[in-house]
Amino acid sequence: MTEIIEVHAREILDSRGNPTVEAEVTLLSGISGRASVPSGASTGEHEMLELRDGDPKRYLGKGVTQAVNNVIEKIAPEIVGMDCLNQRDIDYTMIALDGTENKGALGANAILSVSIACAKAAAAVVELPLYRYLGGVQAKDIPVPMMNIINGGQHADNNVDIQEFMIMPVGAPTFREGLRMSAEVFHNLKAVLKGKGYNTAVGDEGGFAPNLASNEEALAVIMAAITRAGYEPGKDIAIALDAAASSFYEKGKYILAAEKKPEKTADEMIRFYEDLANRYPIISLEDGLAEDDWEGWKALTQAMGSRIQIVGDDLFVTNKKRLEQGISKGIANSILIKLNQIGSLTETLETIQTAKEAGYTNVVSHRSGETEDSFMADVAVAANCGQIKSGSLSRSERLAKYNQLLRIEEELGDRAVYRGRSALYSVR
């Protein structure tokens, strides 16, 4: 009854109106699993290949019919007949079939869609919640959300360099309360921005995207919103940043257009972050330097890694080998987990385990081009990752993940654990 009898795929649209892959896996029992994959705007150089058609006459070259056909014509014949409960075998069969280092033959988007669809079908056939099927009885940590309430960089059409200014409800007793607190801050931020005459249109991830006087002004208005909502900055609500520094790294320099002194070295960037962390309750910094600036990253970790969380996204791209390289060099103390960066569920879970064994935190993350699929929320709980990024408090493709976590927390009842500030091991 757990045998795969059919694999299908189709082209659907993501939250930016661009095509992406959706796959369906049907079992002998008649049960099926369906999954769609996201797409990033600020993509790491070392990510697995997202296969696009490149035909300018269709979707401006962003069609995914080739990836869809690879699922139907190449992947399906290989995995039909396999047992959906053997996730690792299925994933490594697809990886071997692709045969490239970057999944460039079949496309990471093709492989991942099938990988997740298989997991969903398997959970359904054994009648277990997805997080329980993937994580077993120990799956109980409800992650602390990082909510991107001011969008900049490549996620917005504004003059703010830093890509994400996020809030984390570290003082909440439960996820449900943390979500409420964050929503109240979000709505108060809208009022603060309106009061200053700023635009309150939102960016790709549902956060506000105003033109501000500087990157620091984003922090100032967030602080005002936290206080206006009746919370204490740092104690109830902390701040996290995703600089996405590779996007403003040019010829060995970091160019912050919104700053009075725009051109900075790695050392000057570190001092810039240290100054902000000294004056604002920043507890996490993601991609503070460029993805291949290993020496800069080491200096950043040495300077700030004992007091805040230093997260590698473009640096590690959910890749176990790159993570192991970083661990050996003492670089960062946390990794961002994006399933489509590596392209299979099995490899994602292996990377999460490698990080845990090294004492690194895991932050499960969405992409800027998302779908309504909430699978990543179940993965975060299944692997007890403790933290999740799914955008702001608007746009339903973002809230789908948060709402799924509400359901999981309710289902777990007294067994649910919300760790708050302690989910960030390195924060003092």
Swiss-Prot record:
GO MF term (any one): magnesium ion binding
Keywords, ordered alphabetically: Cytoplasm, Glycolysis, Lyase, Magnesium, Metal-binding, Secreted
Uppermost EC category: lyase
Biological process terms in GO annotation: glycolytic process
Pathway: Carbohydrate degradation; glycolysis; pyruvate from D-glyceraldehyde 3-phosphate: step 4/5
GO cellular component: cell surface; extracellular region; phosphopyruvate hydratase complex
Active-site positions on this chain: 205, 338
InterPro entries tied to this protein: Enolase (IPR000941), Enolase-like_C_sf (IPR036849), Enolase-like_N (IPR029017), Enolase_C (IPR020810), Enolase_CS (IPR020809), Enolase_N (IPR020811)
Transmembrane helix recorded as keyword: no
Enzyme Commission (EC) number: 4.2.1.11
Cofactor: Mg(2+)
Cofactor stoichiometry and binding remark: Binds a second Mg(2+) ion via substrate during catalysis.
Residue positions binding Mg(2+): 242, 286, 313
Catalyzed chemical reaction(s): (2R)-2-phosphoglycerate = phosphoenolpyruvate + H2O
Positions bound to (2R)-2-phosphoglycerate: 163, 338, 367-368, 389
Compartments reported by the entry: Cytoplasm; Secreted; Cell surface
Pfam families: Enolase_C (PF00113), Enolase_N (PF03952)
Record function comment: Catalyzes the reversible conversion of 2-phosphoglycerate (2-PG) into phosphoenolpyruvate (PEP). It is essential for the degradation of carbohydrates via glycolysis.
Family indicated by similarity: Belongs to the enolase family.
PANTHER family: ENOLASE
HAMAP family recorded: Enolase (MF_00318)
Protein name: Enolase
Originating species: Syntrophus aciditrophicus (strain SB)
Protein encoded by which gene: eno
